[in-house]
Amino acid sequence: MNNIKLHSISRVKVNLYLHVIGKRKDGYHNLDSLVAFPNIGDKIEIYPSKNINLTITGRLKKELPIKENLILKASKLFKNNKNGADIHLNKNIPISAGLGGGSSNAAVVLKLLSKLWNVPLPSIQDIVLLGADIPVCMDWRLQRMQGIGDNTSFISSHGYLWILLLNNGDKTPTNLIFKELSPNNFSDVINIPKLNDTRSLIKFLKSTRNDLEKVTIKKFPSIKILLDHFEMTSGCLISRMSGSGSTCFGLYEKKSEAVKAKNFLLQKFPKSWIKVAKILS
């Protein structure tokens, strides 16, 4: 029994576009976003144990308090559970970076614990209460995320692109950015056309935006500098901020273009976290 080990990567969540539709009476905002999950992320391992324990390693472990971690909160969603688990998180994804790292961690742990304990997943209602964007992180296919994040649907796509992600270390807390939003930042509901190939995807994305970008740039002007440098790279089809920032990304048709852009940006921002990955395949 003690030799059982379950493990998984916990992928980053990238908002290819992010529209804020309006503010609800409960204070939350209604969103509309196309979400992709490049094969980059933290690593999670789970072992059977008498109690629930969490250990964190990796270059960012000191920035992540254990007591308030979403992983521990997620483990408590299994009602009337008497099982335990040793959970090991190797944390390498930037925190407060617009990549949904905490929500992705929680989603992966929910799936692994369900498998380890052979019990059903908690209700979607309970999962949403823990984190509005945890449900979309339960599946890594291309998805449209609406409502407060609890309304998700799969989007069919063909072909693949290469994504270059860059984070300069700025912390952009989501609640801070949303507090600065005004109706002038809101968008109307749109229809997503059939995405028959990567060309149609890029054409569609160019008609969209990230409604949080302008607000975040006012607080963190360095993000505008990052985006300007993405536009300087050869082959960049579109550049944008993910989520509430501060991570920015560029999409490329060829891996060689993304790698060349990575080398260029590393020269300009040598202390940044920067990764290349395939998406939409």
For each predicted feature, which ranges?
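Charge-dense, low-complexity intrinsically disordered segments
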Residues: 61-65, 100, 217, 252
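Generic structural signal for hydrophobic residues
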Residues: 71-74, 109, 226, 261
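Conserved glycine-rich beta-strand-loop-beta hairpin in the small C-terminal domain of fold type I
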Residues: 245-248
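Short, well-ordered alpha-helices that flank and scaffold nucleotide-derived cofactor binding pockets
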Residues: 76, 111, 115, 263, ...
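Short glycine-rich phosphate-binding loop at a beta-alpha junction
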Residues: 240-242
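DPxDG-like acidic metal-binding loop motif
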Residues: 71, 97-124, 136, 140
